[in-house]
From Swiss-Prot:
GO cellular component, as recorded: cytoplasm; cytosol
Organism: Geobacter sulfurreducens (strain ATCC 51573 / DSM 12127 / PCA)
Subunit details: Homotetramer.
Catalysed reactions listed for this entry: beta-D-fructose 1,6-bisphosphate + H2O = beta-D-fructose 6-phosphate + phosphate
UniProt gene name: fbp
Name of the protein in its database record: Fructose-1,6-bisphosphatase class 1
Enzyme Commission number, as recorded: 3.1.3.11
Length: 313
């Protein structure tokens, strides 16, 4: 139920109050609020932290920035001490971390602590992406998520979440509290913007034809190089498509199913959009490993359906 009526001033609704009206468990309310609290420390690190390298590599052989490591530590510590999490997986960790033994009412969390961290030194927007499952199994279909969210650290700090009952945006105010700014965000069937990731000269022929189709119908290119701000643009404008397709030499693209694709697909689908790897809905992929990757086309349902036609899906 909306918290305000047309023509009336909307009073501030904080995140915890909104969650308590979603008919979810107290433990899940607590978990989402703990992640929101952690993000306040992450944004402080982004604004004031070390922009250098950490001297370590993650599971994928990528050099870790000091901000990656610090952001991961902040979120992991909050999850461990929440008391409602059993298993934790992070893009910056080599394996699943067990916070406590399995028990009723616990959740597992997969997250990318600071997606797009290499953009911080040029002062572009970055974000945290979170996927939540009931129980202790993380390697399952994204459709089994009970919640997903991202926090965008841009000119404003915004938190977008869904527990399967609409998609809602909260904005951090001057007191560092998240208050409701948009409720029940929805996608239009068609859009006129596109965000294409990957080097275009490495696109497969079918992907190149799809991009040419988008250009021929007048779609405008809008791409920042950050997954969170680019998805946020598509979602908040309610139109458009983001893609990171299969490439020559990288048939599975770049983005990880568990940490990036599943939570974003969950949010976009709950807003009325769609997400596919070109043949299969992202949320129906059953990951076999933490580092599994897949191509993605995500956004307006008709644009995604057209992408599938070009990909032969």
């Amino acid at each position: 139920m909306p918290f305000s009526e047309p023509g009336k001033t909307k009073f501030q609704v904080d995140l915890r109050r909104h969650l308590r009206n979603q008919d979810i468990s107290d433990n899940l309310v607590h978990l989402i609020c703990e992640i929101a609290e952690a993000s306040k420390y992450v944004i402080n690190a982004v604004r004031t932290g070390d922009l250098g390298v950490a001297g370590t590599s993650n599971l994928y052989g990528e050099e870790q920035l000091a901000l990656d490591v610090l952001s991961d530590r902040i979120i992991r510590k909050r999850l461990i001490h929440s008391g409602v999490v059993c298993n934790i997986a992070s893009e910056e960790m080599d394996e699943i971390f067990q916070a406590q033994a399995d028990a009723d009412g616990l959740y597992s969390v997969a997250y990318d602590p600071l997606d797009g961290s290499s953009l911080v030194d040029v002062n572009l927007a970055v974000g945290t992406i979170v996927s939540i499952y009931e129980g202790c199994n993380l390697l399952q279909k994204g459709r089994n998520q009970v919640a997903a969210m991202y926090i965008l650290y841009g000119p404003r700090v915004s938190l977008v979440y869904s527990v399967g009952k609409g998609v809602h945006e909260f904005t951090m105010n001057h007191l560092m509290e998240y208050t409701l700014s948009r409720e029940n965000v929805t996608m239009k069937p068609d859009g006129d913007i596109y965000s294409p990731g990957g080097l275009r000269k490495k696109y497969l022929p079918e992907t190149e034809k799809f991009v040419q189709h988008l250009e021929s119908k007048g779609s405008k290119l809008r791409y920042s190089g950050g997954f969170v701000p680019d998805i946020n643009q598509v979602l908040m404008k309610g139109k458009g498509i983001f893609m990171y397709p299969a490439l020559n030499g990288s048939p599975n693209g770049k983005l990880r199913v568990l940490f990036e694709l599943n939570p974003m697909a969950y949010l976009i689908e709950n807003a009325g959009g769609a997400a596919t790897d070109g043949k299969t809905p992202i949320l129906d992929i059953e990951p076999q490993s933490l580092d599994q990757r897949a191509p993605i086309f995500i956004g307006c349902s008709n644009d995604v359906a057209t992408a599938m036609e070009f990909m032969g899906g």
